[in-house]
Curated annotation (Swiss-Prot):
Signal peptide: none
GO cellular component: cytoplasm
GO BP annotations listed: protein refolding
One Gene Ontology MF term: ATP-dependent protein folding chaperone
Keyword set includes Chaperone: yes
Pfam entry (one): Cpn60_TCP1
Family statement drawn from the similarity comment of this UniProt entry: Belongs to the chaperonin (HSP60) family.
Organism: Mycolicibacterium goodii (Mycobacterium goodii)
Keywords, sorted A to Z: Chaperone, Cytoplasm
Localization annotation: Cytoplasm
Name recorded for this polypeptide: Chaperonin-like protein MimG
Length: 549
C-alpha cells in the first residue's frame, strides 16, 4: 500500500496537533475542581469520567499524522497507569509541556539530539530531589487524604479505602467489586477466599442465604476432571469413616460422580460440596498447591504422582469452616502448619521480585494475600450504571494512589513538589543545547500546578510565580484559594505516582522532538464507495496502525 510522508517542521507540527488535541481533552480534569468528560459508547449509555487514561483511550483523530501524536501521548498515560494506576493526567500535562517547549527550541535551531540528551540528564536529578523530600505515610489520616484527593476530593472514598488498607496492612490485598446496593462498603475476608462457588444448588445447606456451610470438612484438591464413581469413592470412604463432610475442589465434577454426591446431600447420608478449582491453565496447579499448604493436604495431579484411587486421609486437607456461595468460596481457620505457610509465602514473594509483567505481580500479590488471610473487598454501588462506572474509576484511582504512597512515601501535593523541584536544577551544569533540554524540563515542571489553578478559576501563571518563591512544601490550595503548608493541610501526593508521571512524560517527549520524518498509510477512496454527508468514504473507518489501543 502507498505511504504518505511529512518531513521536518511540517511533520513535527502535525504530530504536535495530535499531542495538543489529546492533552487538551484530558487536562481539564486535573485538580480538585477539575471537570468531567463524557464519552460516547457504541452500545449502552455514555461514560462520564475525570480519569485521564479512560479519556485518552477513547481518542482517535481523523488526521493520521495528528493521530500518531495523540497515540504517543496516550502511551504516556497508559504507561503511567500500568506502573502506578494513577497520575495519568499529570503525565499527559507534563508531556504536552515538554513537547511544546522542546519543539520550539528545535524549530529555533537547537540540535534535537542534544536537547533530548539534556532532558534525559535532567529528569533523574528532579526525581532524586523529589525522593529526598518524600516522607513515609505516618497515619491513617494521610491514607485518607491521599485516597480522597485521588478521587477528586471525595472524602467518602477516602474513608472507605483507608479502612480497607488499615485492616489488611501493607502486604494485604484490597480489591473492588460492583454492588447492587447504593453507596460503598468494605467486606473483610478472614481466611482464604477465591472466586469460584458450588457447582450444584442441591449442595446448599442454608436455602435462605443460598450458601453451603460445612464445619470441620475434609478437602480433596485436584486439577483433574472427575466423572466416574470409582474415582471419587476412595475419598468418600475416607470422609465417611471420619464422619466428616467432604469438599471436592477440582477442575470439574460431572456425570455419575456428581450424581452420587448430589444424592448423598439430598438423602442426608453424606454431606458434601463440589467447588471448581481457582485459577486457569498452568496457574491452576500453582494455586491448588497454595491451598494444599494452607489446608495441610496434597494436590492430586499427574505431576505429583498421586492418583484419585490412592487417596488416603493424609492426602486430604481440612479447616474449621468452609462457606460456598454460587460465586465464591471462603475457607476459615485452615489447618496448615504455620512454618510451611511462611515458607510458601517467602517463595511467592521471591517470585514476585523476579516477575516482569504487572499482571503476574498482581496475581502473586493476590496469592500471597490469600495465604496470609489479609483480603478486603470494597463494594461500590450507584443509582445508575453511569454513576456506578464513574465512581468505580475514581475508587480504582484512589486505591492505586494509596498503594503507591505506602510503597514509596509522599510529597507535597497540588503540583507543589514538581513546581518547586526546579531548585534542584540550579546546580546541574550543562552546556550548549543540553542546557536547553534542562530548561525544557524546568519550564514543564510548573505545568500541573498551573492547570490545577486554572481549573479552579485562578490565574495559573500568577499562582506558579508565588509558589516558586514559597518555602519548600508550601503551595497553593485550589479548594480554598489560599497558600500554606501542603502537609499540614493534607494536600499530598504519592512520590511513586509523581515520579512515574515525570519519567513517562519525559520518555515520550524526548523521542517526539527528535522526529524528522512521519510516515502513514495512504487511504484512497474506492470507486463506487458508499458516501454519507458529513461522514465521507467508508474507507475512513479503517483501523490505522497507530490506533493500537
Amino acid at each position: 500500500m502507498a505511504k504518505e510522508l511529512r518531513f521536518n517542521s511540517d511533520a513535527r507540527a502535525r504530530l504536535e496537533q495530535g499531542v495538543n488535541a489529546l492533552a487538551d481533552a484530558v487536562k481539564v480534569t486535573l485538580g480538585p475542581k477539575g471537570r468531567n468528560a463524557i464519552l460516547e459508547k457504541l452500545t449502552g449509555p455514555p461514560t462520564i469520567t475525570n480519569d485521564g487514561v479512560t479519556i485518552a483511550r477513547e481518542i482517535q483523530l481523523r488526521d493520521p499524522f495528528a493521530n500518531m501524536g495523540a497515540q504517543l501521548v496516550k502511551e504516556v498515560a497508559m504507561k503511567t497507569n500500568g506502573v502506578v494506576g494513577d497520575g495519568t493526567t499529570t503525565a499527559t500535562v507534563l508531556a504536552q509541556a515538554m513537547v511544546r517547549e522542546g519543539l520550539e527550541a528545535v524549530d529555533a535551531g537547537a540540535n534535537p539530539m542534544r536537547v533530548r540528551r539534556g532532558i534525559e540528564r535532567t529528569v533523574p536529578v528532579v526525581v532524586e530531589s523529589l525522593r529526598s523530600h518524600s516522607v513515609e505515610v505516618g497515619s491513617s489520616a494521610d491514607l485518607r487524604r491521599i485516597a480522597a484527593l485521588a478521587a477528586s476530593d471525595d472524602e467518602a472514598i477516602g474513608d472507605v479505602i483507608a479502612a480497607a488498607v488499615e485492616h489488611v496492612g501493607k502486604s494485604g490485598v484490597v480489591t473492588t467489586e460492583e454492588s447492587d446496593t447504593l453507596g460503598m462498603a468494605v467486606d473483610v475476608v478472614d481466611g482464604i477466599e477465591f472466586d469460584h462457588g458450588y457447582t450444584s444448588g442441591y449442595m446448599v445447606t442454608d436455602p435462605e442465604r443460598m450458601e453451603a456451610v460445612l464445619d470441620n470438612p475434609l478437602i480433596l484438591l485436584t486439577n483433574k476432571k472427575i466423572s466416574q464413581v470409582q474415582e471419587i469413592m476412595p475419598t468418600l470412604e475416607v470422609a465417611k469413616r471420619a464422619d466428616r463432610p467432604l469438599v471436592v475442589i477440582a477442575e470439574d465434577v460431572d456425570g455419575p460422580a456428581l450424581q452420587l454426591l448430589v444424592g448423598g446431600n439430598m438423602h442426608k447420608t453424606m454431606r458434601s460440596v463440589v467447588v471448581r478449582a481457582p485459577g486457569f491453565g498452568h496457574r491452576r496447579v500453582a494455586e491448588l498447591e497454595d491451598l494444599a499448604v494452607a489446608l495441610n493436604g496434597h494436590v492430586i495431579a499427574k505431576d505429583t504422582g498421586i492418583e484419585l484411587g490412592e487417596v488416603t486421609r493424609e492426602h486430604l486437607g481440612s479447616c474449621d469452616r468452609l462457606t460456598a456461595t454460587e460465586n465464591d468460596t471462603t475457607i476459615v481457620g485452615p489447618h496448615g502448619l504455620q512454618n510451611l505457610v511462611d515458607a510458601r509465602v517467602a517463595q511467592l514473594e521471591a517470585q514476585r521480585e523476579r516477575a516482569r509483567l504487572d499482571a503476574d505481580r498482581d496475581i502473586l500479590d493476590l496469592r500471597i494475600a490469600r495465604l496470609t488471610g489479609r483480603v478486603a473487598v470494597i463494594r461500590v454501588g450507584g443509582a445508575t450504571s453511569v454513576e456506578l462506572k464513574e465512581r468505580m474509576l475514581r475508587v480504582e484511582d484512589a486505591l492505586a494512589a494509596t498503594r503507591a504512597a505506602l510503597e514509596a512515601g509522599i510529597v507535597s501535593g497540588g503540583g507543589t513538589a514538581l513546581a518547586q523541584a526546579h531548585r534542584a536544577l540550579d546546580t546541574l551544569e550543562l552546556v550548549g543545547d543540553e542546557a536547553i533540554g534542562r530548561d525544557v524540563v524546568r519550564r514543564a515542571l510548573a505545568e500541573p500546578l498551573r492547570w490545577i489553578a486554572i481549573n479552579a478559576g485562578f490565574e495559573g501563571d500568577d499562582v506558579v510565580d508565588v509558589v516558586a518563591d514559597l518555602p519548600l512544601g508550601h503551595g497553593f490550595n485550589a479548594l480554598t484559594g489560599e497558600y500554606g503548608d501542603m502537609f499540614e493541610e493534607g494536600i499530598i501526593d504519592p512520590f511513586k505516582v509523581t515520579r512515574a508521571a515525570l519519567e513517562s512524560a519525559a520518555s515520550i517527549a524526548a523521542l517526539l522532538i527528535t522526529t524528522e520524518t512521519a510516515v502513514v498509510e495512504e487511504i484512497v477512496g474506492q470507486p463506487g464507495a458508499i458516501m454519507a454527508p458529513g461522514f465521507g468514504d467508508l474507507a475512513e473507518g479503517m483501523v490505522r496502525p497507530s490506533n493500537i489501543y
